UniProtKB/Swiss-Prot annotation:
Lineage: Eukaryota, Metazoa, Chordata, Craniata, Vertebrata
Protein name as annotated: 5-hydroxytryptamine receptor 2A
Organism: Canis lupus familiaris
InterPro entries: 5HT2A_rcpt, 5HT_rcpt, GPCR_Rhodpsn, GPCR_Rhodpsn_7TM
GO cellular component: axon; caveola; cytoplasmic vesicle; dendrite; G protein-coupled serotonin receptor complex; plasma membrane; presynapse
Glycosylated residues in this chain: 38, 44, 51, 54
Length: 470
């Protein structure tokens, strides 16, 4: 211990030995009564190393000290965000696989849902982990400053793409209900992909000013060490263009679609003529019956049977609208708090408490991220095809098992037997009708003979003459 003391040092302690450079006292938990000596820097470092758990690190903004302060605590919010990230990535990968592998799901609406799942999956891969990292560092940006603008750009891009996809789905279904023939004729896979490309192009255009101006001026994307949009114009214009305007279009077209479906269903129930007219616009595959048989069936068909196909298609549309309505509702409910609070932070900048607004934004943004994880759960609960596909993919079965031959025979033989019995009954009825018709013919012949016997002989002679002439 002698090497730690200076030869001519006084025996009274100084403040430099027990006080940090910034003047704040630190409780080391050691009493230097024995000797009351002034320690050197080496002794100060030893005491600090033995008691570093008592450090407060106030005013210390260096990354090692900052990470030491926050990483030692149990961060339950970071754990919850990690669960959201895993659910988002895994669920949306299942949606992408289902639409890619299941032929039943390969239509325009599901292509939009697959593109929406891609946006949500990329949000879970590229945006959410960095946001979780900022939570671990006390909402301060731990990465290089140039990456802040890129991260905000990706966040706005994928969030805007989500609302744009839902808006496009709502518009596409409304057009399909209003003009089904034109929509079915021009709604090919290529056209669906062109619409998806247009959605992504609009989303990129809306979010592109963020990296353009943010990389030139850090003050637009940094505020007190936190990475966020600090420009009020960005916040206001971006909120309206990327959320509120598409939200208005989506809600209006969705309710117009519901109204049109209800109107068609009412027409199908009330007016038989309209049912017959609408039945020709059915998207279901036509049967292989000949035109003559279809004409004969249309003659003997009951009035209420004309609209069965149309009612079935309308029922399917209503079910699809129900599922999409749940997706729309959850998206709106989960993202509205963030955008409303974001606008309030700009409008009431002086009167609002910035700490409360910042805390609300940190919570509401993760509620919005949660909507990306909820969509696959909605598909699973309300769509049988998605549910069966997800269960097979989890079991590493990527192809649907075909029914064995026994099940095919069991399902087809009773139907064939029923049809054959119906044919036999029809033949018996036809034979009875033929027998009745022959009896009537015989009776008519007998009456004719009796009438001919009672007739005068001169008439018979004239008839014989006519027959001989023929």
């Amino acid at each position: 211990m002698d090497v730690l003391f200076e030869d001519n040092a006084p025996l009274s302690p100084t403040t430099s030995s027990l006080m940090p450079s910034n003047g704040d006292p630190r409780l080391y938990g050691n009493d230097l009564n024995a000797g009351d000596a002034n320690t050197s820097d080496a002794f100060n470092w030893t005491v600090d190393a033995e008691n570093r758990t008592n450090l407060s690190c106030e005013g210390c903004l260096s990354p090692p000290c900052f990470s030491l302060l926050h990483l030692q605590e149990k961060n339950w919010s970071a754990l919850l965000t990690a669960v959201v990230i895993i659910l988002t990535i895994a669920g949306n990968i299942l949606v992408i696989m289902a639409v890619s592998l299941e032929k039943k799901l390969q239509n325009a609406t599901n292509y939009f849902l697959m593109s929406l799942a891609i946006a949500d999956m990329l949000l879970g891969f590229l945006v959410m982990p960095v946001s979780m990292l900022t939570i671990l560092y006390g909402y301060r940006w731990p990465l290089p400053s140039k990456l802040c603008a890129v991260w905000i750009y990706l966040d706005v891009l994928f969030s805007t793409a989500s609302i744009m996809h839902l808006c496009a789905i709502s518009l596409d279904r409304y057009v399909a209900i209003q003009n089904p023939i034109h929509h079915s004729r021009f709604n090919s896979r290529t056209k669906a992909f062109l619409k998806i490309i247009a959605v992504w192009t609009i989303s990129v255009g809306i979010s592109m000013p963020i990296p353009v101006f943010g990389l030139q001026d850090d003050s637009k994307v940094f505020k007190e060490g936190s990475c966020l949009l600090a420009d009020d114009n960005f916040v206001l214009i971006g909120s309206f263009v990327s959320f509120f305007i598409p939200l208005t279009i989506m809600v209006i077209t969705y309710f117009l679609t519901i109204k049109s479906l209800q109107k068609e269903a009412t027409l199908c129930v009330s007016d038989p003529g309209t049912r017959a007219k609408l039945a020709s616009f059915s998207f279901l595959p036509q049967s292989s019956l000949s035109s003559e048989k279809l004409f004969q069936r249309s003659i003997h068909r009951e009035p209420g049977s004309y609209g069965r196909r149309t009612m079935q298609s309308i029922s399917n549309e209503q079910k699809a609208c129900k599922v999409l309505g749940i997706v729309f509702f959850l998206f709106v409910v989960m993202w509205c708090p963030f955008f409303i609070t974001n606008i309030m932070a700009v409008i009431c900048k002086e009167s609002c408490n910035e700490d409360i607004i910042g805390a609300l934004l940190n919570v509401f943004v993760w509620i919005g991220y949660l909507s990306s994880a909820v969509n696959p759960l909605v598909y699973t609960l309300f769509n049988k095809t998605y549910r069966s596909a997800f269960s097979r993919y989890i079991q590493c079965q990527y192809k649907e098992n075909k029914k064995p031959l026994q099940l095919i025979l069991v399902n087809t033989i009773p139907a064939l037997a029923y049809k054959s019995s119906q044919l036999q009954m029809g033949q018996k009825k036809n034979s009875k009708k033929d027998a009745k018709s022959t009896d009537n013919d015989y009776s008519m012949v007998a009456l004719g003979k009796q009438h001919s016997e009672d007739a005068p002989t001169d008439n018979i002679n004239t008839v014989n003459e006519k027959v001989s002439c023929v």
